[in-house]
A protein has these predicted regions:
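Acceptor-binding helix/loop patch of EC 2.4 sugar-transfer enzymes
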Residues: 114-150, 183, 188-203, 210-213
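N-terminal pre-catalytic "stem/leader" segment of glycosyltransferase-like enzymes
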Residues: 1-88, 127, 228
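Short N-terminal targeting/anchoring amphipathic segment
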Residues: 79-97, 111-115
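A short, active-site helix/loop in glycosyltransferases that binds the activated sugar's phosphate group
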Residues: 156-184, 188-194, 256
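Conserved catalytic-core segment of nucleotide-activated headgroup transferases in glycan assembly
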Residues: 35-61, 186-285
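Nucleotide-sugar-dependent
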Residues: 122, 228-231, 275-282, 287-312, ...
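Membrane-proximal helix-turn-helix segments that form the acceptor-binding/catalytic region
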Residues: 82, 104-107, 135-163
Length: 341
């Protein structure tokens, strides 16, 4: 493990700006793009709207400005449609307000695109998604919720002129379902993450990447839905802990250990869910970042974000050979690919 003398930084959501500021940002330049998401969060909204707007606004030479808007801005949809030249709807479920927003842009002869980062728009995959997430398939309400959500997502997609997604595998699913033209814009880190990641990497480089003599394997879970993914790697973790007294495990987030890990409790640490900026500190403190995934069409649609967030702080990843992980990792060179066994 790396002993990083690096305090936790103060964090608050940088996207919580009043509408007046977001409109002013949109109006800064000649080419103006409005991103829409139902409500702000630190997952899809951050990657597919906030980060996109941030990088577009940083490119002075392109004369492009961008901002983001939400359902609670509904009273100003006409103003947004007047100002922006293009609308990007990010992973949003159909409702009369979203239909109205799209209609306003269409009535003004403006292009509308749909951006999605998961296979959550085609109900043919609902059972696969539910099973992969480990949800209770015996609950009728669960099926109502998931079929409704994915159907509404697909309906919003069908109202748009084109689509954007995170990788070629998901792009093919989008094109097959919608018949629309699909472009790939991969996920990437924002400036807040990169600034802290650079500092963490520099500290490790100054120490010549020498830790405290103990090797730590880290599993960083963004949500409880990764329970079955973690279950893939847990037996191997127990074997490694039994064979290597110098190895420790750190689990971050919502995952609960199985019984095989109980006898190693003294070498298994838990960390609560962290904001995405301070998470870079934890990522930088471990030698290896574990990225197990079940093998199916839903997980092949996942992006490589867990890989590059770890790489930015000089942490190697051990990943399942999913579509995107195979594309990002050259086995034995910039990480490792490992099948479940």
């Amino acid at each position: 493990m790396f002993s990083l003398h690096f305090p936790q930084v103060s964090y608050s959501d940088p996207w919580l700006q009043p509408l007046s500021e977001r409109l002013a940002t949109l109006n800064r330049r000649a080419v103006r793009i409005a991103y829409f998401y139902e409500e702000p969060n630190n997952s899809t909204f951050r990657y597919r709207a906030y980060n996109m707007a941030q990088v577009l606004n940083a490119q002075d030479a392109e004369n492009v400005s961008a901002s983001y808007f939400f359902l609670f801005d509904r009273d100003h949809f006409d103003e947004i449609a007047d100002c922006a030249q293009m609308l990007v709807i990010c992973r949003s479920r159909y409702c009369h307000e979203i239909n109205g927003l799209i209609t306003k842009f269409r009535a003004r002869g403006k292009r509308v695109l749909f951006d999605v980062d998961d296979l959550v728009f085609d109900t043919d995959y609902t059972h696969l998604v539910v099973a992969t997430l480990g949800l209770d398939v015996r609950q009728d309400r669960l099926w109502d919720d998931w079929f409704a959500m994915m159907s509404r997502m697909g309906q919003t997609l069908k109202l748009c002129d084109g689509a954007i997604t995170t990788n070629e595998f998901l792009a093919s699913k989008l094109a097959d379902f919608s018949g629309l033209s699909v472009s790939v814009v991969p996920n990437f880190m924002n400036q807040e993450q990169l600034s802290l990641a650079d500092r963490v990497y520099e500290l490790k480089a100054e120490a010549c990447f020498k830790g405290n003599g103990r090797k730590t394997l880290g599993y960083f879970s963004g949500s409880p839905s990764h329970r079955l993914d973690y279950a893939i790697v847990e037996p191997a973790l127990a074997d490694v802990l039994a064979q290597r007294p110098d190895v420790e495990v750190m689990v971050v987030g919502y995952i609960e250990h199985g019984p095989s890990m109980q006898k190693f409790a003294g070498r298994v640490s838990r960390q609560p869910f962290h904001d995405y900026v301070n998470l870079q500190r934890l990522l930088g403190s471990v030698e290896f970042n574990l990225m197990p995934l079940q093998s199916n069409a839903f997980t092949d649609c996942k992006s490589e974000l867990k890989y590059f967030e770890a790489a930015s702080v000089g942490t190697l990843s051990i990943a399942s050979p999913s579509f995107t992980y195979r594309g990002a990792i050259r086995d034995g060179e910039n990480g490792y690919l490992a099948k479940a066994h």
